[in-house]
Amino acid sequence: MPFYGGEELATVYDEALDEGFGLIASNIAEPNIMMGLMEGADRMDSDLLLQMSGGACRFAGDGDAVAGLKAMGNYIETIAERYDIGVFLNMDHQTDLEFIEQQIELDIPSSIMIDASHEPFDENVATSREVVEMVEAAGSDVLIEAELGQIKGVEDEIEAEEAFYTDPEQAVEFVDKTGADLLAISVGTQHGVAKGKDLELRPDLANDIRQALRDHGLDTPLVLHGSSGVQPDQLQEMLKHGICKVNKDTRYQYEYTRTAYDRYNEEPNAIVPPEGVADARDTFFNETDWSPNKDVFDPRVAGRDIRERIADVHADLTEVSGSAGQSLFK
């Protein structure tokens, strides 16, 4: 299926709100993660929302975020054609307005998340509204996600030492003034490595925010950031209250590295010289009796394991979130 835009993504969110499921928004720090995500989503008949941060774009573009976005956009579009699901791209935690304007002009993302949550309320409103107006001026169908409240932890070099819960009435004012299509709320999750048992999650607050918005005629999809440590039962409880986009990044990063670590530790002497053999990498071990084993160190060997593991993890997450079997583009 094609790599879709904001208009089609909006229909997925409408369905998610109606049916009570969540779309797992999955960050791609590296291409093998993307490949695994596509395989896992297709296996479970779930539409797929990929995400890229500014840091991921710079990494893909060797320091040039625009080049990285173009390269990954082409890659996603080409690979997405092989699968019978809808594939979308959200730009996660964007703070650079110039880069956001370039994203809109390139017409690559399906949606963009403007993160001005660290600013005072009025400045957050003004910045978020400015991005919405960029989309309107361009005649684009890109959806805009904005954040109100602050989530503790570090995400793509954005650090918050404290968490500030989202106020329901302020949420109504924020959505009304900004025109944001989606609202990311702070209800006790945490960016980075966090344990669900240690999180003070507030499904009651998510419910209050959802109800306050609906009371004012705003059927705005809610977004849960910092969910890698949230346990299945906790997530399913949150999904009952208007959450229909659930961000995952840290979990995939860990699974990527752990899978490679496990693979290489199965046969360490095929990669690293055993004790007593000189570590003569500069001559590629020409003068030693030992040689590395290409069948083990070929990066595609670990890469295939990584793709398979990411696919399995994402497939499990679609079952937990309820998006399995819900693709609108099958």
UniProtKB/Swiss-Prot annotation:
pH dependence statement: Optimum pH is 7.5.
EC numbers, comma separated: 4.1.2.13
Binding site for dihydroxyacetone phosphate: 192, 226-228, 247-250
Positions annotated to bind Zn(2+) 1: 93, 191, 225
Keywords carried by this UniProt record: Glycolysis, Lyase, Metal-binding, Zinc
Effect of a null allele: Loss of growth on fructose, but growth on glucose is slightly stimulated. Loss of growth on acetate, D-xylose, or Casamino acids.
UniProt record similarity statement: Belongs to the class II fructose-bisphosphate aldolase family.
Protein name, UniProt field: Fructose-bisphosphate aldolase class 2
